[in-house]
Amino acid sequence: VRQDWIDYNGHMNVAYYTMAFDRALDEIFDDWLGVGADQAKELRMGPMALQSQIHYLDELKLGDTFACDFQILDADPKKIHFFTTMINLVSGAEAATYESLSMNVDLDARRSAPYPAPARARIEALLAAQADLPRPARAGARIGIRRKG
């Protein structure tokens, strides 16, 4: 966690959690799934977020290091539903989670489009490899104020 990511509360600002998750996803989408920047340049299509939610669980402070774990929860020919957990490598605590639904988009038509066959095969392979992982407890969580009584 860099100094310029720290806010007036003395911890990493929420905007940088979003940026950190986005950068981790760029690597996963590019390197693992083949649906990131290279696909956008070569095939004029790429994933766009439809919906996302972040849970802030434990503060990250100046100098903390972190990593992100990625799990595909579901996929179809055009969409990927995934869950990412940010782990504080100093304390071992879950710092945050990020759940999102993304859709492949034809960048010229600006409409949804199926993932190319090679990307779809990688998505399906990762989905199958993670099939026995437990569904994260926070996946699909609603947002709201809990009322007593």
Question: For the regions a protein language model found, what residue spans apply to each?
Answer:
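Hot-dog-fold acyl-thioester-processing enzymes
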Residues: V1-A49, D106-G149
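Conserved beta-strand and immediately adjacent loop positions that scaffold enzyme active sites
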Residues: R2, F83, L101
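Hydrophobic beta-strand-centered segment that forms part of the acyl-chain substrate-binding groove
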Residues: F29-H81, A95
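Solvent-exposed strand-loop boundary residues in beta-sheet-rich modules
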Residues: V90-G92, D108
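A structural microfeature
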Residues: A96-Y98, P114
